[in-house]
Amino acid sequence: MAGHSKWANIKRQKAVVDAKKGKTFTQLSRAIILAARSGVPDPSGNFQLRTAIDKAKAAGIPNDNIERAIAKGAGTFGGDNASLEEIRYEGYGPGGVAILIEALTDNRNRTAADLRVAFSKNGGNLGETGCVSWMFDQKGVCVVSGVVDEDQLLEASLEGGAESYEMTEDETAEVFTEVANLEILNQTLKDQGFKVTDAELRWIPSNHLEVTEPDQARSLLKLIDTLEGLDDVQNVTSNFEMSENLMAVSFA
């Protein structure tokens, strides 16, 4: 998972930069709208909304924008947000790498067309529903920073119902659990004094496809970057494994 985790770290850093440019404001705002619409529009009683707000704040989105998105989701602001729907798309990248795309859109035809263009221009192809999703399992993931004692992390993770954890970089770990247990794990880790910087649902590949060829690596990372740059796209997950050196050279 080292290569894939490195890519996750790059994406988190990139999201902050992109948000400051205004690129991800739409994506994060839509996530808040959907969360507020799906449950109570109060973050204290809606874990999905609370985590969406935390991500927006971490990316530097102003409180006024966040409050406006909550109001839109609650139906108290105006505008047609009922048409927003969650859709999962699937496809193949260069070399047969499996790719899952989670989108939030008010026009599925537009989204599918944008995705198809992105795939075709970068050596991949958009597939049918179910073509690659069987290669992934959805899990809850807590990203924990400032981990200086792995034994304490293990004890707290087990207490919170975690299945496993992985150290991804210096003093940072990802703790995995069942989807329904994410909120409990998140709270348990915080109660034990750990700093949880992110809590999210993530698709985890059951097997990884090793990428070693530089041209394939460049095309693949360009494809993923292009997909993530689309306003309707919320998350992109793939099953590639790549050395950090190759990733750094290809992503530069």
Swiss-Prot record:
Q: Which GO terms describe its molecular function?
A: DNA binding
What is the protein name given in its UniProt record?
Answer: Probable transcriptional regulatory protein all4276
Name the species this protein comes from: Nostoc sp. (strain PCC 7120 / SAG 25.82 / UTEX 2576)
* Claim: Nuclease is one of the keywords in the record: no
Predominant subcellular localization, coarse grouping: cytoplasm
GO terms (BP aspect): regulation of DNA-templated transcription
Quote the InterPro entries the UniProt record gives. Integrase-like_N (IPR017856), TACO1_YebC-like_2nd/3rd_dom (IPR048300), TACO1_YebC_N (IPR049083), Transcrip_reg_TACO1-like (IPR002876), Transcrip_reg_TACO1-like_dom3 (IPR026564), YebC-like (IPR029072)
Highest taxon of the lineage:
Bacteria
Concerning HAMAP family, the annotation shows:
Transcrip_reg_TACO1
Any one Gene Ontology cellular component term annotated for this protein? cytosol
Keywords assigned by UniProt? Answer: Cytoplasm, DNA-binding, Transcription, Transcription regulation
Location in the cell reads: Cytoplasm
Q: Does the keyword Transcription regulation apply?
A: yes
Q: What family is this?
A: Belongs to the TACO1 family.
